[in-house]
UniProtKB/Swiss-Prot annotation:
Species annotation: Pasteurella multocida (strain Pm70)
Organism lineage: Bacteria, Pseudomonadati, Pseudomonadota, Gammaproteobacteria, Pasteurellales
GO cellular component terms listed in the entry, alphabetical order: cytoplasm
Keyword Transmembrane helix among UniProt keywords: no
Keyword tags: ATP-binding, cAMP biosynthesis, Cytoplasm, Lyase, Nucleotide-binding
Record keyword Disulfide bond present: no
Protein EC: 4.6.1.1
Name the record gives this protein: Adenylate cyclase
Residue span of region Catalytic: 1-541
Subcellular compartments: Cytoplasm
Primary localization class, coarse: cytoplasm
Protein family (similarity comment): Belongs to the adenylyl cyclase class-1 family.
One GO process term, biological-process aspect: cAMP biosynthetic process
Listed GO MF terms: adenylate cyclase activity; ATP binding
Length: 838
């Protein structure tokens, strides 16, 4: 078969030119500056220019300097102004290290906004040394930081075309790099959206091959018959090897991206669902694009906008299945993404080609003026609209995700994503989407920037026929009518969780006027609690790193509120001047505990906000038990432990003693102190013995008619802090102690340990952190992982083939680790499959 490469090149060059014009059209001066200088700064290396790294490999094949770049050089490098003849040779080396530079993604599409990233593929020669690639990586890092000065985000991806074609593009997962999560689907997105900024053209775009699976053999034929020379092209390979195995990892990746870019991920995860519905005859959009481009069938109104092409494909899919509500949500998401950051007062907005095309779509969709106005006012949305939008987003994303999981089950696919990437992705998704008792749901901050309320009213309900017992918050001043109409904003069983929800979602700020209706909590107490919470926890902290996600979700900081909602000290009429510790927990002739409620708020290593509420005579016991169970042996102590007492009486004393108890229990649990010999505590007239075990505290009531001596805990609370002691070695443990450091509730975790004879041990922690041990296993660990993943995907379908008793939830995907024996002990790292990396 013969190909008209000359004609194809003209068409591709025209589209590149059009897309570059559209990328610059309506964009800021800063964006235009960075976009136009990008290739120049990769092509040359000079101390006066951004991105300079000594000995960095530079030079882009077939580079032609633009007038804008030439003027920039003349003003930035003074020596050039005197001798402009140096311009053509202004390069570090005569041999070009870079074969091509391409921008992909939303740039030049209807979804490009002032916040759009420049996702840039830098394809380098495959013979660069490791040292040269590291220098080039440093150069791109410096250019990334340079662009940030203009508020432009660039993500550089160093690409080796030969390595990519061999399915060996599996760099570590990062916030912008999908790692091993998707391969062919990534290439599909690249081909349909790529803009060549400089360098060699993409071979795949120029060859209209009828059977895509024959692409590689057809290229070999063209080379053999000397119709093409591969040195003239960049070739990442064809799209004929799309496997069903990619869908699961790709869906996880899109959910992951949906945390920070929700409306963009809506259309992308739906495209995956659409593709899976066509399997095994999936017709990728990139193939559709190439056929339309090379046969002259491109839509003249948008010249193949990749974002609109996704929308068209998704529209056909949802219409076919009569899912019109989902289609409406997708259209609203597309509109919100395309108009993100748009200033409607800008006189040039009406001349924006993106806005003009949106107007055509709105007419096709028959939208009302009220809906358009509501969407245009997204920046001003408040909590009720944001909650509705957030819940709709989660519902939509999770439905697509579950449909893709069902597809994986149906076709019994083995995920192509590597175990270490699964671990990071699922834990990230677990923190963002999994709803758990006591966990604060953080509304997506990308929906609206300002949720603050002028007034917040908290009211307590008990014994109502209309409302469930608990706490409610409304964004208004006290009004009976508001309650009757059930127009509350949020509900929680505990005040602690409700206040934390309002605070960490930026609804409650320093400028919010607080109101409360409660027989148990005064406005003064509420204000004190809010202030203590605000001063103890910043709303935002540094983003969780992938390294953090490989560790257990250790508590980083916590506050404890004593007697916030139940305060037994209000009933005390006679005040004792001297108080012993035992008196506080078993006070007066009725031996009542003066700790009526304990509320705990903590932030863990994964940046989750969790709350705990304990109420009743044994509140202190339950709080110590549950808190200790969340602290594992050898873990670092929380960076912040604050105890606040809101008691009517004995406020300071209660605070001090609860602080001492919590610190003592945590110190014992992490191994910084030894348990007291007589670890008894008398609470509400009963004697309790504490047993400090590997996974926390257990309690046992001691029944005795004899009067017990002062407890070890009481004595400890009255003495000075002891010097740090070393924990006794545990000789009863039958597994490496380092495993405890990685124990994470909610996940099934597998730890592989190699033996000297070639066999291996497997330590399994279930979702409740119970351990099972399998010793001297043989075979390949990679095959064991595939077996476990298959059981996970099939769990619930075949209960007889489930030896690990796996229960599938949304994001409890099995986690795999390797134990490495080192001189200073055992190190645990995410399992890296040698098969996947080979």
């Amino acid at each position: 078969m013969n190909y008209d490469l000359f004609s194809a090149q003209k068409k591709v060059e025209y589209l590149d030119k059009l897309r570059i014009e559209r990328a610059l059209s309506g964009s800021s001066g800063e964006f235009q500056h960075v976009f136009q200088l990008l290739t120049l700064l990769l092509h040359i290396n000079h101390p006066n220019l951004p991105g300079y790294v000594a000995d960095a490999p530079v030079g882009i094949a077939d580079f032609v300097i633009s007038p804008y770049q030439k003027q920039y050089l003349l003003t930035t490098v003074p020596s050039l102004e005197a001798n402009q003849s140096l311009l053509p040779s202004f390069s570090y080396r005569s041999t070009n290290a870079i074969l091509g530079v391409y921008v992909m993604g939303s740039i030049a599409s209807i979804s490009q906004t002032p916040k759009s990233d420049l996702d840039t593929w830098v394809c380098h020669r495959d013979d660069l040394s490791t040292k040269e690639k590291e220098a080039l990586q440093r150069k791109t890092h410096l250019l990334k930081n340079w662009a940030k000065q203009f508020n432009i985000e660039i993500n550089f991806y160093l690409m080796d075309q030969k390595r990519f074609r061999c399915f060996r593009y599996a760099e570590p997962l990062t916030a912008e790099n999908c790692g091993s999560a998707q391969y062919m689907l990534l290439l599909d997105e690249f081909y349909r959206s790529a803009i060549r900024l400089a360098g060699k053209p993409l071979l795949w775009l120029h060859l209209l091959i009828e059977q895509e699976e024959n692409y590689e053999s057809e290229v070999e034929r063209l080379v053999r018959t000397q119709q093409i020379c591969l040195d003239d092209w960049v070739d990442f390979g064809g799209l004929g090897q799309l496997s069903a195995n990619e869908y699961f990892g790709a869906s996880l990746w899109q959910l992951y991206k949906g945390i920070d870019a929700p409306y963009k991920s809506v259309i992308k995860i739906l495209l995956l669902e659409t593709y899976s519905s066509e399997y095994p005859n999936t017709y990728l959009i990139a193939r559709q694009f190439k056929e339309e481009l090379l046969t002259g069938k491109l839509n003249p109104s948008h010249h193949f906008d990749p974002y609109l092409a996704m929308l068209q494909r998704a529209t056909r899919y949802l219409t076919k299945h009569n899912e019109l509500k989902r289609l409406g949500f997708v259209r609203r998401s597309v509109y919100l993404k395309a108009t993100e950051g748009m200033c409607w007062q800008d006189p040039n907005a009406t001349n924006n080609w993106r806005l003009q095309h949106l107007q055509k779509l709105i007419q096709e969709w028959d939208w009302s003026d009220a809906l358009i106005e509501e969407l245009n006012q997204r920046a001003n949305w408040k909590i009720k609209q944001v909650k509705k939008a957030h819940n709709s987003l989660i519902k939509f994303l999770m439905l697509s995700y579950r449909n893709l999981v069902a597809f994986a089950r149906k076709h019994k696919v083995n995920s192509s994503i590597m175990p270490q990437d699964i671990s990071v992705l699922t834990r990230k998704l677990y923190t963002a989407f999994e709803e758990l008792p006591g966990k604060i749901t953080l509304l997506n901050p990308q929906i609206s920037l300002n949720l603050s309320e002028k007034n917040l009213l908290f009211f307590e309900v008990k014994g109502s026929k209309t409302f469930k017992d608990g706490w409610y918050v409304v964004n208004q001043t006290p009004s009976v009518a508001g309650f009757v109409q059930k127009r509350y904003t949020e509900y929680s069983e505990s005040l602690n969780k409700l206040v934390a929800w309002a605070y960490f979602n930026r609804i409650l700020t320093a400028n919010t006027d607080l109101h409360i209706i409660s027989p148990n909590v005064s406005l003064t107490t509420l204000r004190h609690f809010v202030t203590d919470l605000r001063l103890s926890f910043p709303v935002t902290v540094s983003s969780v790193t992938n390294e953090d996600l490989t560790h257990a979700c250790e508590i980083r900081s916590l506050i404890v509120a004593v007697n916030l909602t139940v305060d037994p000290t209000k009933k005390i009429t006679q005040v004792k001047s001297r108080i012993q510790a035992s008196d506080l927990f078993s006070f007066g002739p009725k031996e009542e505990s003066l700790v009526g409620s304990i509320d705990i708020t903590y932030r863990n290593l994964w940046n989750e906000i969790r709350t705990l509420h304990f109420e009743g005579p044994n509140a202190i016991l339950l709080a110590l038990k549950v808190l200790s169970n969340k602290i594992h042996r050898g873990a670092p102590s929380p960076k912040l432990i604050q105890v606040f007492s809101y008691s009517h009486r004995y406020r300071r004393t209660l605070s001090n003693i609860v602080t001492a108890l919590i610190n003592r229990c945590i110190s014992i649990q992490i191994g910084d102190a030894l348990p007291p010999q007589n670890n008894l505590l008398r609470v509400a007239g009963k004697n309790w013995q504490f047993f400090f075990e590997e996974r926390g505290i257990s309690l046992q009531e001691i029944h005795s008619n004899e009067e017990l001596e002062a407890t070890g805990f009481d004595t400890a609370l009255q003495t000075e802090v002891e010097e740090k002691e070393s924990a006794l070695p545990d000789t009863s443990r039958t597994y490496p102690p380092e495993i405890d450091h990685f124990a994470s509730e909610g996940f099934l975790q597998f730890f592989f340990e190699d033996n000297s004879d070639g066999s291996f041990n497997v330590y399994i922690l279930d979702e409740a952190n119970r351990i099972e041990i399998y010793r001297n296993c043989d075979g390949q660990k990679e095959k064991k992982i595939l077996e476990i993943n298959h059981i996970y995907q099939s769990s619930g379908l075949d209960e007889n083939n489930n030896p690990y008793k796996i229960v599938q939830r949304d994001f409890n995907y099995p986690q795999f680790y390797q134990l490495l024996l080192q001189e200073n002990g055992v190190k645990i790292v995410p399992f890296h499959s040698r098969l996947a990396m080979s």
